[in-house]
Curated annotation (Swiss-Prot):
Membrane-protein topology: Multi-pass membrane protein
Main subcellular localisation: mitochondrion
Gene: MDM10
Protein name in the entry: Mitochondrial distribution and morphology protein 10
Domain commentary: Lacks alpha-helical transmembrane segments, suggesting that it resides in the membrane via beta-sheet conformations similar to those predicted for other outer membrane proteins and porin.
Organism: Meyerozyma guilliermondii (strain ATCC 6260 / CBS 566 / DSM 6381 / JCM 1539 / NBRC 10279 / NRRL Y-324)
Length: 418
């Protein structure tokens, strides 16, 4: 579950038309959210408040091993309107999960230009003297500077700083990165094949397949250590059901590591993910599986678009249609005519499925992931209780020596924002 400050940062990117999916570091974000989700440890309470449309503050208190907490403040030069508190925030926006990849969603604003904007963030931890800060400066609709720094007396030279200069367009994205840790210099790039060009006036087609190819290159000047990785992402939608799926392939030639993932949204309320890791040098392999299942809010009904015809289905099958919204809908039946008619029909199906997902209201979600080689299971429940967002989970594994079940992690987290 995102913290409220992380949620506001995503709202800032959305308000300034910045597409996070088009960044190389997020190429496996969907599979990571379903397989490597973080389980809370101990008891944690997070309270946030919006003092104005441009600023927010947050207070966090936890008792993991010892009592500690933090104070955070965020300021945005762009007003973050339409950002509700935890009582009204959609559960899909508050939780990291499957993300439909749409490189074309980065469209210009109504005025055609985006004014330069900034976001400032700082957090102070106690007890101790640890500090962290972040600065985001948008120079143009396609370029921004992101700076992150940490000050901690326990770190080498009391802290580190990392800067990203990013250029993000519909066709490609590039990043130049520098870190004071070992004088690390890096370059990342991602290129989309099959997306609509930036000069095209046509709107994006949600059912169009997009192939994204990227790579990153690192070099640590102090230790003279190189780093290299490549990645490929294929995103598409089923023309018969409109359900999206994403496949990725990542490779680290230096370490000989290959990782492939397959993530599919099997229904409006469920997503399945699998990942297979293999090492070319040691021949070690691992299979990881995970899924998420949302629970519909019984007190909220799914809104329908009045412009769409009413489907000719049995009312008793309405709950079943939420699992497969395309079945039994005569409006979505396609007829084998011309290619243009078939394309428009498949586009309507994809668009209808996406609208149903966006308009569905959920009360909670259950996430489960397991790894065969690591022999561990993660279980996480996230949902809404009164005006709070609650996250509770457990992580268990088998002891390799005794085969006994061990409890590695357990906790519960409460989040409130007004």
């Amino acid at each position: 579950m995102y913290t409220y400050m992380e949620y506001l940062q995503k709202c800032f990117f959305h308000a300034t038309r910045w597409n996070e999916d088009n960044i190389y570091s997020n190429i496996t974000a969907s599979s990571h959210a379903l397989l490597e989700f973080l389980v809370p440890s101990g008891l944690k309470m997070d309270v946030s408040s919006r003092s104005s449309p441009n600023s927010a503050s947050s207070f966090t208190l936890s008792n993991h091993h010892s009592l500690n907490g933090s104070l955070a403040y965020m300021y945005s030069s762009t007003q973050l309107k339409g950002t509700p508190g935890t009582r009204r925030i959609p559960l899909q926006d508050a939780i990291a999960g499957f993300k439909i990849v749409e490189p074309n969603e980065m469209r210009p604003s109504a005025s055609g230009t985006i004014a330069p904007s900034s976001l400032l963030y700082g957090r102070m931890y106690f007890p101790g003297a640890a500090l962290e800060a972040m600065v985001i400066r948008r120079f143009s609709p396609h370029t921004q500077l992101l700076i992150k720094c940490i000050h901690n007396p326990q770190l080498d030279k009391n802290g580190t700083l990392i800067a990203y200069f990013q250029k993000n367009t519909q066709r490609y994205s590039r990043e130049v990165i520098y870190s004071t840790n070992d004088a690390l210099v890096g370059f990342r790039g991602l290129y989309n094949i099959g997306s609509t060009p930036s000069w095209s006036p046509s709107p994006p087609n949600f059912d169009r397949s997009v192939v994204s190819v990227g790579a990153e290159l690192w070099y640590a000047a102090r230790t003279m250590s190189p780093g290299l990785s490549t990645g490929l992402r294929y995103s598409t939608r089923s023309t018969s059901t409109g359900k999206p799926l994403t496949m990725t392939l990542a490779c680290n030639p230096i370490l000989g590591h290959i990782s492939s993932t397959y993530t599919v949204k099997t229904s409006v309320a469920s997503t399945f993910c699998s990942r297979y890791d293999f090492n070319l040098f040691s021949y070690a392999s691992n299979l990881s599986l995970g899924f998420e299942l949302f629970n519909f809010d019984k007190n909220a009904a799914v809104e329908r678009n009045p412009q769409l015809p009413t489907p000719t289905t049995n009312p008793s099958a309405s709950k079943q249609n939420l699992i497969n919204p395309i079945r039994d809908h005569s409006y979505y039946q396609t007829t084998p005519s011309t290619n243009a008619t078939t394309y428009q029909s498949s586009q309507t199906i994809s668009d209808s499925f996406q609208k149903l997902v966006n308009r569905s209201e959920f009360s909670s979600v259950v996430k489960v992931s397991t790894s065969l080689n690591d022999r561990l299971v993660r279980l996480l429940w996230e949902g809404r209780f009164k005006d709070f967002l609650v996250s509770s989970g457990v992580k268990v594994s088998l002891n390799p020596a005794t085969n006994a079940v061990e409890l590695n992690r357990f906790g519960i987290s409460f989040s409130y924002a007004s």
